[in-house]
Amino acid sequence: MNILLLTSEFAPAAGGIGTYAREIAAAAVRLGADVTVAAPDYADDGVARADRAAPFRTHRFRGGLHSIRDLPGKVRLARALTAADGHDVVHAVDWPFFLPVALARARTDARLLMTVHGTEINEMQTAGKRLAVRLAGTFGPRAEVVANSEFTRELFLSRFELPADRVRAIPLGVSEFWFGPRADRDAVRRKHALAPDALVMVTVARLTQRKGHLATLAALQQLAEPLRARITWLIIGPDGEAGHVAQLRAAALAAGGDIRFLGRLPDEEIRDIFGAADLFCLTGVPDPSGRVEGFGLVYLEAGACDLPSLGCNIGGVAEAVAAGRSGLLVAPTPEAIAGAIAKLAEDETLRTALGRGALAHARALSWDRCAAATYGLAPTDDILLPPVDREQVALAPFAAGDVAPAAAGSRGEE
């Protein structure tokens, strides 16, 4: 099978879209496909060296972070690449390539796939974008839409009138990297000056309002002092909105306790910290701007390191955290979060059981399985998705004409 992927985000830029493109392409190669990835070069001469080490071909086009000015160039690129080779599948990995691939459909007999990740569905509800989608026939009869979760699928179907059988939910996978060797737990705790009896809670996410750091902080302040004094909270991830970051840092300072902002860290160090921690906590909250948590890959990455998760039951998080098996899911309120933190902190047996469940859940969701289901490279009958609460779709209403921020990535980058 000959597969062409087109993505507006890729290495060296960090983000969830780039991770998706890289991992599904590599998995498709492992399953026997011939894969080419078209990705921006970010004006970085060093990308060619890294590309040579990849198991797939990489076609770099001139560009960086997507803007509307790039659309004509992406249309020309999609037309040229789809006409050049006998592709069996042309895959628009993210929304900036939806319209270009749709406009190139006359040049190829290939299957046309488009992956939706969550937030961009709401972003496409402005009058201008809906008109462009309709005029281009973006989701016409040949388009197959792949959603990263059942939540995202339901959200898409609530916004666009497509037959339900043309929109599939295929869960993401976990890179083998996260199952790899970690530094000794005690050594990592000594390196970070973590008390031997401390309960270490770690969060990995960009410091943005919707990731719920303030909700977690408010929850910690509700805990009884003896328990609160035991908890060390390690916050990993780059800064997001400047105003929010300043508010969060000031609130953490005023709250007291052992709260540490570690900033952006390499994956190897994050993996080591996961191995030294007791609990992964990411308590996202509804965002009125229309941004949603389409899946939540970072919960699975923590799970690959035997770490149980605490999350809020919003968006697609319920499909990344198996409630009661790999972690706990609660309402996005400080009171509910505080109760769950206390429950996990005081019950080591529960944490151990959920950690084992988190590892099993992460193992069950591989990138090979994701690629097989997406491209039809292998049987996929064993891919099961948890049921979705359709009322969750209504948590983040988005009216046509509203403007949401541009989509970004995951795992500390979103």
Feature roles, as predicted:
Residues 41-44, 174, 232-247:
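Glycosyltransferase donor-sugar binding loop
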Residues 92-98, 116:
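Short His-centered aromatic/hydrophobic patch
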Residues 146, 195-211, 217-221, 234:
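Conserved donor-binding/catalytic core segment of Leloir-type glycosyltransferases
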Residues 151, 173:
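Carbohydrate-associated surface elements
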Residues 245-271:
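Nucleotide-activated donor-binding/catalytic signature segment of Leloir-type glycosyltransferases, i.e.
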Residues 275-290, 307:
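Acidic donor-binding loop of glycosyltransferase active sites
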Residues 323-324, 328-335, 343-349:
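Conserved acidic donor-binding segment of nucleotide-sugar-dependent glycosyltransferases
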Residues 336, 343, 350-364, 376:
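A short, well-ordered alpha-helix in the C-terminal region of glycosyltransferases
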